[in-house]
Design a protein with these regions (language model features):
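Acetyl-CoA-dependent GNAT
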Residues: 75-134, 146, 206-207
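Conserved catalytic-core motifs of GNAT/GCN5-like acyltransferases
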Residues: 161-164, 176, 181-196
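Conserved acetyl-CoA-binding loop-helix of GNAT-fold acetyltransferases
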Residues: 137-150, 154, 173-177
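A short, well-structured alpha-helix characteristic of acyl/acetyltransferase catalytic modules
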Residues: 24-76
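Short glycine/proline-centered loop/turn elements that form peptide/ligand docking sites
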Residues: 145, 168-171, 188-193
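Conserved GNAT acetyl-CoA-binding A-motif
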Residues: 152-163
């Protein structure tokens, strides 16, 4: 069996209950897996010290692909604002901000987000993921998605949802392999500066 397919190491998870919402607050301590190039990938929850690197990640990835919602010049968060955002993710039940690292460098980010505070939405979560282009195709996105979905189930979610641009064939193929199914198309979801439009696919997976 290839190294990148081996089971990941035992992970230590700190879980706190939120009795009112019925979902869990989770901090994922570092776990390690091998990618297709036999590089060690560390997966862990983000903390406040990651703010600067996350801001850089947002600016770079938004310029590398047409499949994200923001242009690079729209990333205007200050370091303090990003620190506050990370802190809120650490403290909010039902949220996980997962970072992937190789040799101490952030290579990707995957988030588990609640769909809102309403009790009738408490069974649903949203997944979002992006990697630096140079690290795509090495199995890192898959391992991050697998980890995020496992933790989402542990937090009490019953289904995971995501939105993906219709032209993003590689991402859609990965999501379908992981059990996501399309349930709708949103025409003209995004409009680019050159006047082109892009549709989006809504996808969902039962956990």
């Amino acid at each position: 069996m290839q190294n990148w397919k081996r089971s990941f190491m035992i992970c230590e998870i700190i879980i706190f209950s939120d009795r009112e919402k019925g979902i869990m607050l989770m901090i994922l301590k570092p776990i390690q897996r091998k990618d297709k190039q036999n590089r060690t990938v560390t997966l862990r929850s983000a903390d406040v010290s990651d703010a600067e690197a996350l801001l850089r990640y947002l600016k770079v990835t938004s310029g590398e692909t047409p499949f994200l919602i923001r242009e690079p010049d729209e990333i205007k968060l200050t370091l303090e604002q990003e620190e506050a955002f990370i802190r809120s993710k650490m403290e909010e039940p039902g949220e996980l901000l997962l970072i992937g690292e190789i040799d101490g460098k952030q290579v990707g980010n995957c988030s588990v987000m609640s769909m809102g505070s309403f009790k009738r939405y408490a069974h649903r979560c949203e997944i979002a993921i992006a990697l630096y282009q140079e690290y795509c195709g090495a199995g890192i996105g898959k391992m991050m998605m697998e980890t995020a979905l496992q933790e989402a189930k542990k937090m009490g979610y019953e289904q995971a949802e995501l939105e993906v641009i219709s032209d993003n064939a590689n991402a859609i193929a990965l999501y379908e392999k992981m059990g996501f199914k399309k349930y709708g198309t949103f025409p003209n979801s995004m409009k680019y500066s050159d006047g082109r439009y892009a549709d989006a696919e809504f996808m969902m997976k039962i956990l």
